[in-house]
Amino acid sequence: KYDCNAFTTPCKELCASRLPQQNKCVPCMTHSLNKDDRIPSACEEDLAVWMAMMMMMYLTRQSVFMGNPVLVLAGSKTLEQLGMPKLLTQPGQTFDHDVLEIHHAVPVRRMRGFDQPEQKYELAHFTTQGWGAHYHVDMAEEEGQVVTFGRFNRQGTRMMVAVGHTLGCEFRPVYCSPAVYYEIEGGAREFRQALAKGGYGHHQAIIYGNHVKELQELGEIVGFEVEYFH
């Protein structure tokens, strides 16, 4: 209708307006559907992660997950809590090192590629009142899936990228879900510190595969710096 090729929305301000409560809706599924329809779509008006998402989607022809990065400290959560009981025989075991959690209610079904079969999904609700449709996708269905992380700085001149692999995926009954857990090359804690010191901000864009080299080449062509954390 509007011929748009990108989308974002002020999620927290939207909630404060009470319009979602009145209309019983949240923007989460819109973001998921947009991305699977090849339209970069970012939460919370975060244009720094939106730029990274756009570069990654256009470059690889794959859909992109995005979310809040949270440092999970060594020994603080069991493997069962990290959504990993199917992978190991001791679900009560804990990690002896830090891992990175990424959570948001905007998973996608075309992480493998726009020309590949869609991943399976199930519908869920965002609120405790049972409204606010979004869906869950098991982002740990392939053990050890290699992924690339990306985000631009606030000036839009530099992009930090990192590589990791998937450890587990936890579905939560409400709020931002799924929560996906990743091992980061170079260390999860060190990655978070590098993001803070570099002035990069918060959300991360995640794409299947190691695409660091292609992003570096794209940066040379388009004119932005790529900082590779590892």
Predicted features and spans:
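A charged, amphipathic alpha-helical module
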Residues: 1-20
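Conserved active-site and cofactor/substrate-binding residues in soluble primary-metabolism enzymes
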Residues: 2, 6-7, 46-50, 209-213
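Short, glycine-/Ser/Thr-/acidic-enriched flexible segments
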Residues: 12-14, 71-72, 107
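Extended, charged helical/alpha-beta scaffold domains that provide interaction surfaces
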Residues: 16-33
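Acidic, His- and aromatic-enriched active-site or binding-groove loops in soluble protein domains
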Residues: 30-38, 43
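Catalytic phosphate/nucleotide-handling subdomain of diverse soluble enzymes
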Residues: 40-79
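Conserved anion/nucleotide-ligand pocket segment
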Residues: 78-107
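Extended hydrophobic packing segments that form well-structured cores
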Residues: 110-230
